[in-house]
Curated annotation (Swiss-Prot):
All residue ranges annotated as the NTR domain in the record: 25-148
Full protein name: Metalloproteinase inhibitor 1
Gene for this chain: Timp1
UniProt subcellular location: Secreted
Residue numbers of Phosphoserine PTMs: 179
Lineage of the species this protein comes from: Eukaryota, Metazoa, Chordata, Craniata, Vertebrata
Signal peptide range in chain numbering: 1-24
A Pfam family assignment: TIMP
Residues covered by region (Involved in metalloproteinase-binding): 25-28, 91-92
Keywords: Disulfide bond, Glycoprotein, Growth factor, Metal-binding, Metalloenzyme inhibitor, Metalloprotease inhibitor, Phosphoprotein, Protease inhibitor, Secreted, Signal, Zinc
Annotated GO biological process: cartilage development; cellular response to peptide; cellular response to UV-A; connective tissue replacement involved in inflammatory response wound healing; negative regulation of apoptotic process; negative regulation of catalytic activity; negative regulation of endopeptidase activity; negative regulation of membrane protein ectodomain proteolysis
Biological role stated in the UniProt entry: Metalloproteinase inhibitor that functions by forming one to one complexes with target metalloproteinases, such as collagenases, and irreversibly inactivates them by binding to their catalytic zinc cofactor. Acts on MMP1, MMP2, MMP3, MMP7, MMP8, MMP9, MMP10, MMP11, MMP12, MMP13 and MMP16. Does not act on MMP14. Also functions as a growth factor that regulates cell differentiation, migration and cell death and activates cellular signaling cascades via CD63 and ITGB1. Plays a role in integrin signaling.
Length: 205
């Protein structure tokens, strides 16, 4: 009795993939602090294998082994052990496709919490932990939280650009050739005085 429904689900999946094939997922990479502040959960974890696909919901889930939670203690409550990361099946719908086969490699994962489950996408800030600078690793563990809800990293997308508020910090990595993500790797936008935020060196904290 389940075969017709499975075939129908597969047909729907194929149809949606054809419709969405011309609409590639597109998102600008955020500053790490923005990714931290805008996420419900930030964890360090290892991916434990290939995803399990649910053809009915068009979502797949990756089994993960969390090694440390950096943000989200209050959000998850008693469910402090996150075992799965959910994402759309199709990359055209911003589904995340994990490429690494190394199950011992630790990743920084930022995501949203929906119905008690961790959801990630191709737009999530999700990188191998080892690729972060030591300053960024410290910031994800401690520093970035001080700017959440108070300060805003304001991206400069074209020159000239200007700040819209004293609580904004102008992020210029994307327009300065040769910057090598210098601001992203070494600075955080943090409060200096009430109503004023400035770039602060992560190495100085």
């Amino acid at each position: 009795m389940m075969a017709p429904f499975a075939s129908l689900a597969s047909g729907i999946l194929l149809l949606l993939s054809l419709i969405a094939s011309s609409k590639a997922c597109s998102c600008a990479p955020p500053h790490p602090q923005t990714a931290f502040c805008n996420s419900d959960l930030v964890i360090r974890a290892k991916f434990m294998g290939s995803p399990e696909i649910n053809e009915t919901t068009l979502y797949q889930r990756y089994k993960i082994k969390m090694t440390k939670m950096l943000k989200g203690f209050k959000a998850v409550g008693n469910a402090a052990d996150i075992r799965y990361a959910y994402t759309p099946v199709m990359e055209s719908l911003c589904g995340y496709a994990h490429k690494s086969q190394n199950r011992s490699e630790e990743f920084l994962i930022t995501g949203r919490l929906r119905n008690g489950n961790l959801h990630i996408s191709a737009c999530s800030f999700l990188v191998p932990w080892r690729t972060l600078s030591p300053a960024q690793q410290r910031a994800f563990s401690k520093t970035y939280s001080a700017g959440c809800g108070v300060c805003t990293v304001f991206p400069c997308l074209s020159i000239p650009c200007k700040l819209e508020s004293d609580t904004h910090c102008l992020w210029t990595d994307q327009v300065l050739v040769g910057s090598e993500d210098y601001q992203s790797r070494h600075f955080a936008c943090l409060p200096r005085n009430p109503g004023l935020c400035t770039w602060r060196s992560l190495g100085a904290r």
